């Protein structure tokens, strides 16, 4: 990667790493024409402050979400000993599924949350998985919209502002991008890079 940047001293480069420590170490090895960053640092600078300020707020617990969203116990069928039996998913468990669905959506290249982003337990009956996804979808959509609402006073994770940045289809400010450890990238990161129109992207790994 250093040789690539050395061969193009007149062009602005961007080295993208998965964490700040790797980016900081890389910055000491590249010349000044290469900026070393993480996806999150690029996103943090671009997303409205009202959203990133929510990183400092306390996160909503599953029990709070269950009560706030008025989630009720659901009786479904699960596989036990080679046959299906009735099983009750309690509100706090449903709330965790909702929160996890938003997190899963944030790691994808999808434009908007969908029922399929809810990852139901594999031991549920297939028909019940489908009905559970559809049943909880309004809660998933609400949780996402509240997460990106600067006026909603609840904490968020770093995945929220990264996803919001990705949805804006950002242009990375460089002539070329060096993406290290590309084999570990999720669909969100790859989606951002694939949409770069005027920037050469070099994948490594």
Model-derived features: positions:
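P-loop NTPase Walker
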Residues: 1-54
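Alpha-helix C-terminal capping segments
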Residues: 4-9, 23-31, 66, 161, ...
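A structure-centric signal for secondary-structure junctions around beta-strands
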Residues: 10-12, 59-60, 173, 198
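Short, flexible active-site loop motifs that bind/organize anionic cofactors or intermediates
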Residues: 13, 32, 66-67, 151
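Non-catalytic, well-ordered alpha-helical scaffold segments
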Residues: 20, 37-44, 92-100, 130, ...
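Short alpha-helical interface patches
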Residues: 39-47, 117-128, 161-164, 190-192
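ATP-hydrolysis module of ASCE/P-loop NTPase motor domains
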Residues: 52-143
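Conserved helicase NTPase motor core
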Residues: 132-205
């Amino acid at each position: 990667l250093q040789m690539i940047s050395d061969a193009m001293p007149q062009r602005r480069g961007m080295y993208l790493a998965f964490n700040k420590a790797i980016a900081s170490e890389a910055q000491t090895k590249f010349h000044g024409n290469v900026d070393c960053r993480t996806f999150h640092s690029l996103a943090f600078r671009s997303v409205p402050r009202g959203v990133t300020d929510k990183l400092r707020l306390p996160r909503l617990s599953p029990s709070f979400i269950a009560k706030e969203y008025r989630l009720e116990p659901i009786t479904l069928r699960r596989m036990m000993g080679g046959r299906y039996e009735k099983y009750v998913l309690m509100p706090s468990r449903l709330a965790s599924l909702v929160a996890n669905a938003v997190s899963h959506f944030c790691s994808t290249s999808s434009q908007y949350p969908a029922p399929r982003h809810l990852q139901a337990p594999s031991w549920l009956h297939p028909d019940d998985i489908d009905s559970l996804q559809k049943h909880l979808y309004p809660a998933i959509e609400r949780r996402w919209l509240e997460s990106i609402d600067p006026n909603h006073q609840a904490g968020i994770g770093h995945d929220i502002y990264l996803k919001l940045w990705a949805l804006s289809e950002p242009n990375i400010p460089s002539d070329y991008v060096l993406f290290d450890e590309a084999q570990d990238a999720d669909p969100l990161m790859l989606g951002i890079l694939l949409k770069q129109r005027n920037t050469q992207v070099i994948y490594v790994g």
